[in-house]
Amino acid sequence: MDRETFHSCSSLVKLPRQIHQQHCSSHFIEYIEREIPYSKFFKNYLIPNQPCMFSKKFTEEWNCRKKWVTAEGKPNLQRLLHEFDETPVPVANCSVKEYNANPKQIMPFKEFIQYWRESIQNGHSSPKGCLYLKDWHMQRNFPEHNIYKTPIYFSSDWLNEYWDTIEVDDYRFVYMGPKGSWTPFHADVFRSYSWSANICGRKKWLLYPPGQEDFLRDCHGNLAYDVTAPILQDKGLYAQFEEACQPLEIIQEAGEIIFVPSGWHHQVYNLEDTISINHNWLNGCNLDIMWQFLQDELSSVQREIEEWRDTMDTWHQHCQVIMKSCTGIDYAEFASFLKTIANNRISFLNSSPRNADSCQDLLAESLCALGPHHAAFDLQRVLHIFEIMLNNEDFKRLDPATLSFKPEDLLQEIREAIRTIV
């Protein structure tokens, strides 16, 4: 990031978010044919939270596009079987609806490949239903395979940076599914960004801008499972359905990468036998969206157990526990998340020299590539959200023992680090 982008975007991110009305009448997204400056992607897509598609040129050198795909452009099932054989993988049944999602099971990879082959031979039909290998942490389990490289546009990835640091989880996934497999209507974890690269095959995406999902809830407040289902025409169940805009309908070809912005709900179909790589990620540009999501989730929990507020001394702590069980994070861990991100950037800005030759690991390499102004931007965003959090009544109620640091001390360190750049 250059100095000009830093100064222009530092003011933009503090403005109220705009409603995405322009996409309610549009049926296309911008297509990026060849490399553009990172600052252009940052200003045109990350900050305004707008979708786009990258051409297959951005993935043509990936090992997975060479090794996992046949000369005919189909999944190389034999090669995949050789590489992963008995590996346990998560597989969803797209033919079954369970709690507004598809039930999953763990099965050996070779069993899924056997199913896939039989499905293809039977015209993409199987008595087992439509099975879809999804949310597989392949990169975490097989880092030595080196099958792809994250494009620089998606490299400011706080989500995976934090979870890699604590060595608990990650949000990098491989999906493999036959023609006809699909993912029901949803928004991504923590309302994060996502990027999805088709290694082979074709997908159809139905994208709705933030806010449109409110028109796609039933009379009980439940989000639609399938936005194309005839039941949505029932005004008794979906009273506001007709107020929703038409979705952006996007066809993604082999090799292309789609950028799905924060909070955009979507439904996805595999039009052919398809393999894709997907990351959920967030950074300073959509940190405010994650924080708002966490507040909304906590409010929802509080409403559910409101009747016990006056009779339970630890009611607020219980709300945090329930929230974490539902969403995967609570306010204390969110604060720890921000601290980790801040500390990494403070260390980077305090290091000398700050160049690619001195970078010893992937995180340092990423910070070097993005530059000191990006690190300063990140720190400004952490500072801004932390200042808001310190005035939040629910955050104030946290037991100090749940935090391993004093937020006020961290904020002072952040201010001092920013001054070295600004």
From Swiss-Prot:
Residues 139-298 form the JmjC domain. Gene3D superfamilies: Cupin. Its cofactor is Fe(2+). It holds the Pfam family Cupin_8. PROSITE patterns: JMJC. Catalyzes the 2-oxoglutarate and iron-dependent C4-lysyl hydroxylation of ETF1 at 'Lys-63' thereby promoting the translational termination efficiency of ETF1. This is 2-oxoglutarate and iron-dependent oxygenase JMJD4. It comes from Danio rerio. The lineage of its organism: Eukaryota, Metazoa, Chordata, Craniata, Vertebrata. The gene is jmjd4.
